[in-house]
A protein has these predicted regions:
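Active-site nucleotide-sugar/metal-binding loop of Leloir-type enzymes
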Residues: 70-84
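Short beta-strand-to-loop element that shapes/binds the nucleotide-sugar donor at the catalytic cleft/hinge
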Residues: 112-127
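Short beta-strand/loop segment that forms part of the nucleotide-sugar
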Residues: 8-9, 30-41, 57-59
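Short, acidic, metal-binding catalytic loop of nucleotide-sugar glycosyltransferases
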Residues: 19-31
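C-terminal catalytic/acceptor-binding lobe
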Residues: 154-223
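A short, glycine-/small-residue-rich helix N-cap motif at loop->alpha-helix starts
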Residues: 60-69, 73, 122, 148-150
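Short beta-strand-to-loop acidic/aromatic patch adjacent to the donor-nucleotide binding site
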Residues: 82-93
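Conserved donor-nucleotide/metal-binding helix-loop-beta segment in metal-dependent transferases, i.e.
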Residues: 97-113
Length: 223
């Protein structure tokens, strides 16, 4: 039985999930893949046609991945089945064999976060990440409430550094097939979450939370 659940929010990109499944198979991943979709996604039937082992569907109330990621993390955590929780975008592609084992080996050492090399941000930002279940429990999710999309990786890096438990694995490749890397076309999903108003809103929420008593208490409990 795997100890790692990897959550992948996705909208309008069923082909990406198909490609991601192939990447999991090619790298001999044994973690459980949980795909999260919006109930109003016009391509929802195509996701269902993939016959995924784990598909969660939620009402969409805002743009971005933060809300569906947190809803899924809470629901999956409540199952009591997993020790560790990961996030991949639907535009990430694991390339290293047994990459998920690399993650769990680190997390077996204690409460913390781990990420690999996405060949775009590298060590700079954990665009794909895994964390100990204790973090999910204490945070009641994987990111602070009210974030939308763009500052999720900033939060993970900040939290990992502040609790002294952030591990970067440069040889564990989880390629980010992003337009900024010239590896994908800009679609409506990218347009929506990279809009200036989303960036501005996320920065305000991020800065406020990182400087809050709630965040300082979170760090204290995790150390």
């Amino acid at each position: 039985m795997t100890s790692l659940a990897v959550i992948v929010p996705s909208r309008g990109r069923p082909q990406n999930i198909k490609d991601l499944i192939e990447s999991f198979e090619n790298t001999k991943a044994t973690c459980d893949l949980w795909v999260v979709c919006d109930e109003d996604d016009p391509t929802l039937d195509q996701y269902k046609a993939l016959n995924l082992d784990h598909l969660l569907i939620y009402e969409r109330t805002q743009k971005g991945m933060a809300r569906p990621l947190n809803l899924a993390a809470r629901e999956i955590f409540a199952l009591g089945k997993y020790k560790y929780f990961g996030f991949l975008g639907d535009d990430h592609r694991p390339r290293s064999m047994y990459w998920d084992i690399d993650w769990t080996i680190v997390l077996d050492q204690g409460v913390g976060l781990v990420y690999g090399n996405d060949l775009l941000q590298g060590e700079n930002l954990p665009t794909a990440v895994a964390m100990h279940g204790t973090i999910v429990q204490e945070l009641d999710g994987m990111v602070p409430d009210h974030l939308l999309h763009l500052y999720l990786d900033n939060f993970w890096k900040t939290l990992g550094l502040d609790i002294g438990a952030l591990t970067y694995l440069p040889e564990t490749i989880i390629e980010h097939m992003h337009p900024l890397a010239g590896k994908a076309q800009v679609d409506q999903g990218y347009v929506d979450v990279n809009a200036p108003e989303v960036y501005d809103a996320d920065k305000i929420v991020f800065d406020k939370y990182i400087n809050s008593d709630a965040y300082r208490e979170l760090v204290r409990r995790l150390m």
